[in-house]
Amino acid sequence: MEDGAKDDYIKDIYRHASPNADTDSFLGSPTVAIDSTLSTSNSLSNLNLDTNDSSSSPPAHNDDVPDIAEVLQEMLATTELPSSTTDLDYEPELDLVGGHRRNLGQLNDYGSPRADSFVSLDPPSIGTEVEQFLSKKKQFFILSSAGKPIYTLHGSDDVILGYLGVLQTVVSAYQADESGDNLMSFRAGKTLVVVAVEGPLILAAVSKIGESESQLRAQLDVLYTQILSTLTKNQIHRIYANQSNFDLRNLLQGTDVYLDALTREIVNGSPSILLGALEPLILRKSIREEIDGVLLSCRTPSLLYGLIVSDSKLANVIRPKKHSLHPPDLILLFSMLFNTTSFRDGEHWVPICLPKFNSTGFLYAYIHFFSKSSALIQISADKNAFFELREAKQQILSQMEDKGLIKALERAEERGRFKPVDVAVPMVRHFLYKSRAHVQYVMPSYETHYYEPHMQRGLLTFYHQLHAQVNSDSSRGSNNGWRFMHLVRNSCIGFAWITPSFELYCVSGPNVSRATLAASIHSIAKWVSQHRERLFVIGGAVF
């Protein structure tokens, strides 16, 4: 995207935050422009899709690729159909224990994504199903290497099958090429398509909202992690080794609700997924330490990890010394718990694969919501630990109730995030601060500048743009890990500052001087450092 186009794009973000915004101008048309750039794993080559341009040079790949690219261009531009230290369970039993063990799919006989968890990028649906499909600003596709559909964000099988067939053909053409290149991404106008090949699965993201390749690739990794939470990597490879055209939806039946919830979170602009970090619950240090003490005193021999989470925010963790769960696994787990209705009743005992912890085996999670939006999660490698962990839950909640800790959690949840005025930086409207050491982030509430959902969505889209810019080659920085980006627009000013210890992204109003903004940035970093033990979960309860 040229510099002028980038300027117009950012302006459009803030036009989108206005009730009179033109949503089509915000993100461009659904058709694909002629100029296209194609990226492979080992090289970057330019591919001109205009067959009338005799000056274009052929790509350095096999002869089939230009024709395939022309087919893809034509179809997209028309409305015609076209390692762990613990031994894990590799084939979890799905029988009931105490009436509570279910697999993730069985939970969704009655589960669904939360209705309040989605802010659409798109205008109201009009026209035919194909026209609606092509008008979407963002798409995700998951298919097998044989072209069988597994998941799509938008569109029925009747609409998507032709597109998936072309996508599978393009990917296969590059895999068959003797150069050893794999198709990584290609761009057509404002549309960026990013492809990830994970064994027998192909994942693709299509975005018209100015996201970078690395951002889309991180989103695809989250979706792949979601699939691995139900079927391990070994299971998937074994299935397709025996039957290459197998329909994986037969085994994932019932878990599409989690993919729906996760893609909604991505489309909403989730800071957790953007930053690859968890949001902690803001809690007094003394309260957090007291809860840690309860978790340690009630720990059972089979417990591997324990978590207390309030409205997707991490409050406490109990873990083995020198071992931590990975944020991508917890982002996945929190999305399943808090963005669907599957786990809200009673207690649950489910096998789950946490791929960043171990992608080849299952752990078992005991999940219990002890208030409307707070849950106790106990994770074990022992499939027979249900009753042991249930008893531990009763002891934990009894002690927390006696010490007033459940009420303390409820008060912290009611207070929510701190307000921008609490930080005493009046020129800053909003910011994201990520502690790289703790892999956690904090941000103020959206008031008073971003009180409407579409305003919040515009802000988060701008953060994605700022994140992409500061992590690009065009950002200013030094070789010691410091980078910064200063973006001046008509409606706002954005600033990103990356250091070895933190990442900070902030947005101010227009006409704020660079000196004032720099002083505000330093004030934010100082304030976070002063309150770090209240803002972040540091270490947790270690055994």
Swiss-Prot record:
The biased composition feature labelled Low complexity covers 41-57
Pfam families named in the record: Fuz_longin_1, Fuz_longin_2, Fuz_longin_3
Q: Look up keyword Nucleus and say if it applies.
A: no
* An annotated GO BP: vesicle-mediated transport
InterPro entries of this UniProt entry? FUZ/MON1/HPS1_longin_1, FUZ/MON1/HPS1_longin_2, FUZ/MON1/HPS1_longin_3, Mon1
Q: Which UniProt keywords apply?
A: Autophagy, Endosome, Membrane, Protein transport, Transport, Vacuole
Q: Where in the cell is it found?
A: Endosome, Multivesicular body membrane; Prevacuolar compartment membrane; Vacuole membrane
Q: Where is this region: Disordered?
A: 41-65
Q: Which domain of life is it from?
A: Eukaryota
Q: How does it sit in the membrane?
A: Peripheral membrane protein
Outline what the protein does: In complex with YALI0F03861p/CCZ1, is required for multiple vacuole delivery pathways including the cytoplasm to vacuole transport (Cvt), autophagy, pexophagy and endocytosis. The MON1-CCZ1 complex acts at the fusion of vesicles with the vacuole, through its regulation of the SNARE complex during the coordinated priming and docking stages of fusion, and particularly at the stage of tethering/docking.
- Return the similarity comment: Belongs to the MON1/SAND family.
Q: What is this protein called?
A: Vacuolar fusion protein MON1
Q: Which organism is it from?
A: Yarrowia lipolytica (strain CLIB 122 / E 150)
Q: Gene name, please?
A: MON1
